[in-house]
């Protein structure tokens, strides 16, 4: 016997990226049984059958709330940081078109991780050591509040090396201009067993118990994939440690390694160069096989090495940061709110010809807070709280009766904007 249900239906509106087409939202009755407690439900919608299924995405469907430049190609996040009241997001960018090539460091700033100001590129290809591209790297805040970029550059022969740049004027709140070190490149893959075209993506630096800086670089060592470890007194002159931070003989070269401390069950971030609390663990992330994988373990200070809690030889079984289109992620310690934030690159699924037609390609995932689960076995993540500022215009319908098979269309919002809806009461239920 059909039951008539009346319920209050508040709908929260929040823009979200999707490559699909716009379509109306419908709610079909009867609803699943409720407990009167405002249970959250998810909407499922389908595009009309006569809609063109082509993967090409019109400009009107370009993401509105994810981080993305106005046009052209973008890939890896590089060197995110919080400094003097501003969040900085650097990124791999092609000034000349929506396909990979001619890579420089794009640069944008924000006060809230939501609204961004686009600036001129921070680094361009203008020296012999980076003429083939200013590739991925990191930012480290040196003592005295001095940011330094360390990044991979490619020379005319596509050999890779690490380079350094400092802000030209630290009093500029946007840090718009950067000066490359005169002694670039500061690090070359010139030791036995190293591959000069597989040596890139340096991590943020950290200070060890001996007071020396450390940094890891993705590379190959004697055919093994590795996070190569280096030491320095001044962040300018580096010496390779005689063993990697960690290595593995069953995977491809590790791109975009990331290394950071986490405390089980505590979503506060940890600065790797500060005193690490007792009981803390470390995460080693690597980008490999087109996905981002990671291990949880401890940083053995005596051995100066990462030791996984569980050694898994089959890389297919390593933990993953994300099961979607997510690669080349970069995290940073946000001293403003004492948290660790991570970004990833979403390449999307359009073809190069589609990208050329659109005029843009690639975006960064919404920034997420990342921390270690209570059991210390896996990383957890959630969009930063600032994203909720985009949720506006709550829609409320009251006294709507749905009989079995009825449809009620919410016309005020597109399905891709709906965050959730809930009912405060269901009449006719026990």
PLM region spans:
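Structural motif
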Residues: 100-106, 157-166, 223-229, 290-298, ...
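Entry beta-strands of beta-propeller and related beta-repeat scaffolds
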Residues: 86-89, 145-150, 210-215, 269-272, ...
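N-terminal regions that are enriched for targeting/export leaders
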Residues: 2-94
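Beta-rich accessory regions
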Residues: 2-7, 15, 20-30, 46-52, ...
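Short loop/turn segments immediately following beta-strands, especially the blade-tip
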Residues: 109-113, 165-178, 230-237, 264-265, ...
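Short consensus segments that form the blades of beta-propeller domains
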Residues: 95-101, 154-158, 194-195, 218-221, ...
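Surface loop/turn signatures of beta-propeller and other carbohydrate-active proteins
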Residues: 38-78, 97-100, 114-141, 173-206, ...
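Carboxylate/His-rich catalytic cores and anion/metal-binding grooves
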Residues: 146-186
């Amino acid at each position: 016997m059909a039951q008539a249900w009346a319920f209050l239906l508040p709908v929260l509106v929040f823009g979200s990226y999707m490559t699909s087409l716009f379509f109306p939202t419908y709610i079909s009755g009867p609803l699943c049984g409720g407990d009167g407690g405002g249970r959250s439900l998810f909407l499922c919608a389908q595009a009309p059958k006569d809609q063109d299924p082509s993967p090409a995405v019109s400009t009107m469907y370009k993401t509105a709330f994810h981080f993305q430049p106005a046009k052209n190609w973008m890939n890896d996040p590089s060197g995110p940081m919080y400094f003097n009241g501003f969040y900085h997001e650097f990124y791999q960018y092609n000034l000349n078109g929506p396909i990979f090539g001619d890579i420089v460091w794009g640069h944008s700033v924000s006060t809230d991780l939501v609204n961004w100001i686009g600036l001129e590129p921070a680094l361009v290809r203008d020296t012999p050591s980076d003429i083939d591209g200013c590739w991925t790297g990191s930012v480290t805040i040196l003592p005295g509040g001095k940011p330094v970029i360390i990044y991979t550059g490619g020379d005319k022969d596509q050999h890779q090396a690490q380079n350094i740049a400092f802000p030209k004027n630290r009093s500029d709140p946007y840090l718009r201009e950067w000066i490359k070190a005169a002694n670039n490149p500061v690090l070359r893959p010139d030791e036995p067993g190293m591959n000069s075209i597989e040596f890139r993506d340096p991590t943020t630096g950290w200070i060890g118990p001996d007071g020396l800086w450390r940094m890891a670089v993705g590379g190959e060592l004697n055919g093994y994939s590795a996070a190569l470890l280096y030491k320095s007194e001044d962040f300018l002159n580096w010496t390779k440690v005689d063993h990697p931070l960690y290595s593995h003989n069953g995977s491809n070269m590790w791109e975009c390694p990331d290394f950071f401390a986490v405390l089980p069950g505590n979503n506060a971030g940890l600065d790797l160069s500060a005193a690490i609390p007792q009981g803390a663990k470390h995460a080693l992330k690597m980008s490999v096989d087109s996905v981002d994988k990671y291990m949880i373990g401890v940083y053995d200070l005596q051995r100066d090495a990462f030791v996984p809690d569980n050694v898994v030889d089959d890389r297919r079984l390593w933990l993953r940061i994300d099961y979607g289109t997510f690669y080349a992620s970069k995290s940073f310690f946000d001293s403003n709110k004492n948290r660790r934030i991570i970004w990833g690159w979403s390449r999307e699924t359009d073809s190069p010809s589609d990208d050329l037609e659109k005029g843009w390609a690639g975006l960064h995932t919404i920034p997420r807070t990342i921390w270690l689960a209570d059991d210390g076995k896996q990383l957890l993540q959630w969009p930063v709280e600032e994203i909720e500022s985009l949720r506006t215009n709550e829609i409320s319908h009251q006294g709507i009766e749905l009989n079995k098979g009825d449809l009620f269309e919410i016309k005020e919002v597109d399905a891709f904007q709906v965050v959730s809806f809930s009912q405060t009461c269901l009449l006719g239920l026990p």
